[in-house]
UniProtKB/Swiss-Prot annotation:
Protein purpose: An aminoacyl-tRNA editing enzyme that deacylates mischarged D-aminoacyl-tRNAs. Also deacylates mischarged glycyl-tRNA(Ala), protecting cells against glycine mischarging by AlaRS. Acts via tRNA-based rather than protein-based catalysis; rejects L-amino acids rather than detecting D-amino acids in the active site. By recycling D-aminoacyl-tRNA to D-amino acids and free tRNA molecules, this enzyme counteracts the toxicity associated with the formation of D-aminoacyl-tRNA entities in vivo and helps enforce protein L-homochirality.
GO BP of this protein: D-amino acid catabolic process
Record organism: Haemophilus influenzae (strain PittGG)
One Pfam family in the UniProt entry: Tyr_Deacylase
Protein name (record): D-aminoacyl-tRNA deacylase
Signal sequence region: none
Gene3D superfamilies to which the protein is assigned, alphabetical: D-tyrosyl-tRNA(Tyr) deacylase (3.50.80.10)
């Protein structure tokens, strides 16, 4: 399971011109689910996202997690994160989870995160437009 996380001052996701998810300060989490993923991996990734210390403390050092920074999460499914780009000039999505499993684990990941923080979401398998203001910029690739 893969999360591309970006520290943001604001982010939103639109579907068909309508904003369906929006946050202020927090993390934009682009979530990719792979074939071998399960709830145990989702638990580990949620724990990592919620506790990853990438927000500045009073000394301007990355020492606070999103919970300590009183931030929010915007979680958006993105199957392209599971792409295999090693060969050729076209990505292969053979490592990606089938849609039913990917949706189940996406919803489960959201549920686990929502137990700790305010969460907004995208729409699974929809064509979405995501806009954000990356604070830093600060972006990390988390893989469990």
């Amino acid at each position: 399971m893969i999360a591309l996380i970006q520290r943001v001052s604001q982010a939103k996701v639109n579907v068909k011109g309508e904003t369906i998810g929006k946050i202020g300060k927090g993390l934009l989490v682009l979530l990719g689910v792979e074939k071998e993923d399960n709830r145990e991996k989702a638990d580990k990734l949620a724990e990592k996202v919620l506790n990853y210390r990438i927000f500045s403390d009073e000394n301007d050092k990355m020492n606070l997690n999103v919970q300590q920074a009183q931030g929010e999460l915007l979680i958006v499914s993105q199957f392209t994160l599971a792409a295999d780009t090693q060969k050729g000039l076209r990505p292969s999505f053979s490592k990606g989870a089938p849609p039913a499993l990917a949706n189940e684990l996406y919803e489960y990941f959201i549920q686990k995160c929502a137990e700790k923080l305010p969460v907004s979401t995208g729409q699974f398998a929809a064509d979405m437009q995501v806009s954000l203001t990356n604070d830093g910029p600060v972006t990390f690739w988390l893989n469990v």
